[in-house]
A protein has these predicted regions:
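C-terminal interaction-tip segments
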Residues: 1-16, 33, 101-117
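Short, surface-exposed beta-strand/strand-loop-strand elements in extracellular ectodomains
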Residues: 48-63
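Noncatalytic modules at the cell exterior or secretory-pathway interfaces
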Residues: 32-39, 88-109
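Solvent-exposed serine/threonine-rich low-complexity stretches and specific carbohydrate-binding patches
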Residues: 9, 68-78
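Surface-exposed loop/edge segments in extracytoplasmic proteins
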Residues: 2-4, 63-72
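Short amphipathic, basic-aromatic surface patches that mediate peripheral association
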Residues: 38-47
Length: 117
C-alpha cells in the first residue's frame, strides 16, 4: 500500500469566535481511501481567554446522502503534543476536514491530509 500526502496547506483563523467552519482541502472530497489528518497546533496558547479550536470530519453514509460528523475534537490552550493527529478513517462518499477557532487570539495552522491507498 502506498502512502501519500493528499493535500496540505496553512489556515489562518479569523477573529475568534469564528461563526462557521473552514474546510481544509476540498470540501465534499470523494477520493476513496484511509486518511489521517495532521494539524500543527503549536501556536495554541493559554491566557485570560485560552485559544480553543474545534476540528470535525464529515462523511456521507451513501453517496446520495448528507455529510454528517463522524469525528470531532476540541483543543483548548497550549497542547503537550504540538501536532494533533486524527485516528485513521475510511472515507469515500463525500468527506470534509474542517476547523474553526472558538476562543483566544487568531492563529495560523499548518495542516496535512495523509492517505493510504
Amino acid at each position: 500500500m502506498a502512502i501519500s500526502e493528499h493535500a496540505s496547506g496553512t489556515r489562518t483563523a479569523g477573529t475568534p469566535p469564528e461563526a462557521g467552519f473552514t474546510a481544509l482541502g476540498t470540501g465534499g472530497d470523494t477520493t476513496d481511501g484511509v486518511f489521517q489528518f495532521y494539524i500543527d497546533v503549536s501556536n495554541l496558547a493559554n491566557g485570560a481567554t485560552s485559544d480553543a479550536i474545534e476540528i470535525q470530519v464529515l462523511e456521507k453514509v451513501l453517496s446520495s446522502g448528507t455529510a454528517r460528523v463522524v469525528f470531532e475534537a476540541y483543543l483548548i490552550g497550549a497542547q503537550d503534543e504540538p501536532i494533533w493527529v486524527s485516528p485513521a478513517l475510511l472515507l469515500l462518499h463525500g468527506w470534509t476536514l474542517q476547523i474553526k477557532q472558538t476562543a483566544g487570539t487568531a492563529r495560523t495552522y499548518d495542516w496535512s491530509i495523509r492517505k493510504v491507498a
